[in-house]
Amino acid sequence: MTEGSQIFLLPISTSDSTKEPLSPVASKAQDPSLLSNRLMIEKQQEEAEWESINGLLMTHGFKPLCLVKGADLRDFIVFDKQSSQKMRQILKTLMEETTRQQSMIRELIETNQQLKSELQLEQNRAAHQEQRANDLQQIMDSVKSKIGELEDESLNRVCQQQNRIKDLQKEYKMLQMKCQQYKKNRMEQEGTIASLQKEIHRLAKEEEERILTQNRVFAHLCRRVPHSVLDKQLLCLIDYYECKLRKLHIQRQFEEDSQSEEKDFTNLGASPNYKGVLMSLQKQLKESKSRIDVLVGEKLSLQKDLENRPTEHELRLYKQQVKKLEKTLKKNIKLQDLIGQKKSDDTEKKDEPSKDSHQQALIEQSYFQVLCSINSIVHNPRAPVIIYKQSKGRAPNGNKDIGQDCGFEHLVPIIEMWVDELTSLKDLYKSLKILSAELVPWHSLKKLDEKEGVKVGDLLFMVDTMLEEVENQKETSSTPNSQTLQAIVSHFQKLFDVQSLNGVFPRMNEVYTRLGEMNNAVRNLQELLELDSSSSLCVVVSTVGKLCEIINKDVSEQVKQVLGPEDLQSIIKKLEEHEEFFPAFQAFANDLLEILEIDDLDAIVPAVKKLKILSY
């Protein structure tokens, strides 16, 4: 094949390249066989190069170029070797550039997807950080509120401590004043104690002198020492007369002093010396002041003695006790005399009847001692006044001689009264039990022990508990009047649009159920949002609003990722195009799936490529 027979079919080309003519000298000089071989080799190389170019074109989806052999040259354009080589180089560079651009586009797509994934991660991280920032903001708000509460509490504590310090300072001042007052009182009491000790010492001396004078007078009169009751009575008489003599002596001294003062006054009136009169008046004033001080001291001591002395009621009781004791002493003396007489008379006759009488006397003595102790309890100053009235008012109906010997008949009505009071304690216990069941039914009372009986302490305890409960109820519960109750009902009707009173209770039940539903919903929201149970409704509403904002932002971002950064009109246009072309594309895709006998859209392109390869 000659150089002129190498024809290439190329798409529309307007090349003006000229053919290189072969010199006749060279063609003649070359050997025809060598020339033909060289041409064949060049032709094969060129065909191989074009085959490689066709392979590149086919890989990029273009139709291959065909080499034409021996045909009419009118429908073809012929290139020389250089232009064909340039064409091959141009096509090769174009294919390489397209592959490079495709790889670059692929890399750009991969980097775009990677950037999208990173952007999604960053957005998720930003949302997480925003949520965390919101949580931290809530924590900071709660901490600020707690800090404010703690500051308020600390301020309140400081104010309370300052007030307490002021109160303590006032109490300290009051205590100091009281301490000073107590010190003054103690000094006064020490002075009074010293004066009283002096007075006691003086009275003790006077008592000793009185006893000595009594004994001396008694020894002078009777020539013996006092040892019996009559001797004591005689000593009392001696003391009585001695006191009268002492009073007369004091009165006589007072009269003598008054007479001497009158004489001084008369002497002063008679003397013409004025200075002497003034001096005597000054002396009299000093003496009168000293006497007034002495009299004031005596008055105070007498007042204290009067305060320390017993009352009239106590004196009566003491006198009665003295009389009873005198009677008991007389009885004891009589019993001792009888026992002594029996011992002296019947020393030889010690038989059983004497022993029985002796035992009976001892038993009577023990009974008498028991009655004396009961009588002392009855006439004790600590005993109630009603017992004294009972013992005084109810006179015995028996013989007067027996009453004078015994003197315990008044104890019988008192003991009867005691028995009646003790039996009435059971009735009082029952009535208090009924009253306690009415007032304080939640208190359980202990059962009454029949062996021990009813005690006054138990009754007092029951009354105290009832009083405490009644006072607590008065303090805690204040019963409203009818006007306030009517105002409450009318206010409820206005709030909840209730026309009649019959509809109040159904509306209250409805409000209660709605309130319960709302509380349950709020509690569920708190659990879902992981909030504290003590958080308010404002916090719940704010957290729900923040969640809605986050969800709306995520939805808008997802729409932007799907549709791209375009405006609303372009999105509407794309949606209209989708509605217009998607049915035809769906029908075409379904037909392809049926023809190719496949189930997935992603498998269409590989199946078509296989068919294309098989067609070649």
From Swiss-Prot:
Coiled coil feature spans: 96-210, 273-335
Listed GO CC annotations: centrosome; cytoplasm
Keywords: Coiled coil, Cytoplasm, Cytoskeleton, TPR repeat
Places the protein is found: Cytoplasm, Cytoskeleton, Microtubule organizing center, Centrosome
GO BP annotations listed: cilium assembly; regulation of microtubule cytoskeleton organization
Function (record text): Plays a role in the organization of both preexisting and nascent microtubules in interphase cells. During mitosis, required for the organization and orientation of the mitotic spindle.
Protein name in the entry: Centrosomal protein of 70 kDa
Protein encoded by which gene: Cep70
